[in-house]
Amino acid sequence: MLDFVNDYSEGAHEKILQRLLETNMEKLSGYGTDQYCESAKQKIREVCECPEADIYFLVGGTQTNATVIDALLEQYEGVVSADTGHISTHEAGAIEASAHKVLAIPHKNGKVTAKAVKQYFADFYADGNHEHMVFPGMVYISHPTEYGTLYSKKELEELSIVCHEYDAPLYLDGARLGYGLVSEENDVTLADIASLCDAFYIGGTKVGALCGEAVVFPKNNAPKHFMTTVKQHGALIAKGRVLGVQFDTLFTDNLYFEISKNAIKTADTLKQALKEKGYTFYIDSPTNQIFLVLEDERLKELEQKVAVSFWEKADDNHTIIRLATSWATKEEEIKALIEIL
């Protein structure tokens, strides 16, 4: 059985496992205060070109989003997101559980536009009863999006301008950031993201790490007592070294970017073969997620040999599925899948 369900099925890159083993018996301070966390932070500051950045290592994506959003918002505020955004669809109401509403707006290929965001803010403040409503306090985006699509630098610049106009932080979810950054269609760098966003995170869980995400407040702008908020959300681990060693390794010799390239390379190979075979794509994704529209009978046959991710029903007789490659996908797996398809 081949498995293309997601990009976090494997454990971790061998270099990470090697470093975890090499440092295993060292006695280190806890909660992210060890030398490896500090080394990783410095390397991230360098690649992001933001020497004053505040950086924190959290355990996973949902915890990270819930923690950052809760820390950035006032009690009466919510977060603007695409209706397809991860916080709106696949985080079990984690944002709402911290008493903040997700203010969903229509997406365009998984993205929100500066025009739509500006219109939302303008409509809100034009309403004479807006004091009785949930205030839009920040904007959430992801790069890549849930559809594997990417924001251009121009789009980020436009969003940043709107957010500054309304004094609303722009927060970027980077769960799959490595895959986005190495895509041929990407024109955004980590330095660009650090310049245009008020907060973002660099995903490790889906890009070669066992677990962990690196939260970056690029302008020395972490919310007051942010570590306490991290603790309250259960996103702080005592053995912070586990995350520090992993990110220190990922940002040594460009490992994070090099292993990300494998996901794009294998996805591109698969997409080309699918195009040649005449398959119907639901959306054109330039990263590691491929969305196909299949007849239900064909899907039943495929699922006997390949594990895929259900996305949504296209109509009564067709289903949209997702195939995901990763840093660990082997060429042999792609060849085998192409033969089956």
PLM features: residue spans?
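Conserved PLP-anchoring active-site segment centered on the Schiff-base-forming lysine
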Residues: A71-T89, K118
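PLP-dependent aminotransferase-class I/II
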Residues: A99-P144, Y151-E158
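Active-site C-terminal subdomain of aminotransferase-like
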Residues: K108, F135-P136, S142, L150, ...
